[in-house]
Amino acid sequence: MMKLNTVLSFKNIIGLMLIIFAGILFYAYILQHEWQYVTLSDEQVKKYRISGKKALSLYQLMKDTHELLTKNNIKYWIESGTLLGAVRHQGIIPFDDDLDIGIMHEDEIHLQQILPQFEQLGYTVSYERAYNICKKTCLDIFIVHKEKNKFIYTNIMLRDKYPEHFFYDHELYPLKKYKFGSIEVYGPSDPIGNLNRQYPEWDKYAIIYSPHSLHLPFLSNIEKKTKFILTPELLKPAQPLGPLEDNVNIVNSAKFIRIYKDIDDH
């Protein structure tokens, strides 16, 4: 009788383990394939917003980049999450923490020549599939070329990783200005097709999770698979919008004064 009870007990343990394993697989499947739809209260939105310091740093970085590239006749456009922010929020997405822009391959050498100007403003410059301009926050400059009727990344690894990140000829040009917080930036002529490819239902829902969202380490697996219904609070851009420094003109003025002083001394 004791031997029979032991066998039954062993079978029960095996059965329980199988049930638990099946439950884990089912839960994993749900997380991978099923999206949750949630409406956040205004108070809950604050949980996901980037800090005010980070927002100010991002706007300053975008302002400095816009002014340096424009001053040096390098045409650029905002793209990816930065473009989504300009279209949907008229500024930085409140839970985004970097900036993305593109330039044409023909302007890459010119860009390389002016990178020291970013360093004069206190930014560090590096390259890994894109040019990275960083201080407290980072901006990526992607290099693009035209292939048939599409503008695509020149970097093959980026093309393979983000096959939907492209513009058709009529979508990109002519570039136009977008409101971006308290400043204006350049972006594509018609962004809708590009946004639809990258962010389906972007005009109805926001997805908080991004692999580089370092300010959100607390996100649960469920939150990562949640589409948050857009509310007026969620549509507000990252804040504050300013005040922003006039760094590019200040550096240029300082250089002019030094040159003038050197001439005067001679």
UniProtKB/Swiss-Prot annotation:
Family, per entry: Belongs to the LicD transferase family.
Compartmental location: Membrane
Parts of the chain that traverse the membrane: 13-33
Keywords: Membrane, Transferase, Transmembrane, Transmembrane helix
Name of the molecule in the record: Uncharacterized protein RP689
Main localisation: membrane
GO MF annotations, alphabetized: transferase activity
Species, as recorded: Rickettsia prowazekii (strain Madrid E)
PANTHER family, sorted: LIPOPOLYSACCHARIDE CHOLINEPHOSPHOTRANSFERASE LICD
